[in-house]
């Protein structure tokens, strides 16, 4: 974080997605739906979401100071692109592990598709994270329970999981393993321990 002071007030500007929560990303996505009269207005709102600097405060700065401040966030115009693997995430002392596509059930894929295919998919990032990353219980990844359980974990991730922690999981899953619904179910059916027995054909 970069520490900045404006009128004796202290603010902190993140330097990468590793310092930005999923909840903040959700707020940024909401800004994409708004119409602005100028780029300065839009930038001021991005600054408020990312740093807590009120739009009124940033718009009172000189143009040079405003440009200097906004330049600190140029990196956020693109999502993380580095190729890395996240094997585990610890939040409040609890270990969370990305789910393995090969052991996901058809029902779990349905839950993913529901949130991914909605027009408001950008608002569901925390819910997708809640399905893709789950707590480890007795050495195994916890099974999905119900919507209340998904929502509770989504709220936790929104507050405490960073975009840097989540985005590699999102990319690895949706760009790679989940290129199509049919492919997903075929991969899951072939690799997961089968519960299906064909008795007569």
Each PLM stretch: what is its role?
Residues 1-201:
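Charged interaction scaffolds used for protein-protein
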């Amino acid at each position: 974080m970069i520490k900045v002071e404006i009128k004796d007030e202290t603010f902190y500007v993140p330097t990468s997605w590793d310092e930005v929560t999923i909840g903040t990303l959700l707020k940024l996505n909401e800004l994409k739906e708004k119409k602005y009269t100028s780029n300065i207005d839009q930038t001021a709102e991005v600054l408020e979401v990312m740093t807590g600097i009120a739009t009124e405060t940033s718009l009172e700065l000189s143009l040079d100071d405003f440009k200097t401040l906004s330049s600190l966030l140029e990196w956020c115009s693109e999502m993380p692109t580095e190729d890395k693997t996240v094997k585990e995430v610890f939040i409040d002392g609890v270990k969370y592990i990305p789910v393995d596509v090969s052991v996901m059930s058809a029902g779990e894929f349905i839950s993913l598709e529901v949130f991914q295919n909605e027009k408001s998919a950008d608002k569901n990032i925390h819910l997708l994270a809640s399905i893709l990353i789950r707590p480890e219980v007795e050495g195994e990844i916890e099974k999905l329970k119900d919507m209340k359980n998904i929502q509770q974990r989504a709220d936790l991730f929104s507050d405490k999981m960073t975009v840097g922690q989540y985005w590699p999981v999102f990319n690895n899953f949706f760009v790679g393993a989940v290129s199509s619904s049919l492919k997903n179910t075929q991969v899951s059916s072939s690799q997961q321990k089968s519960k299906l027995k064909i008795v007569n054909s």
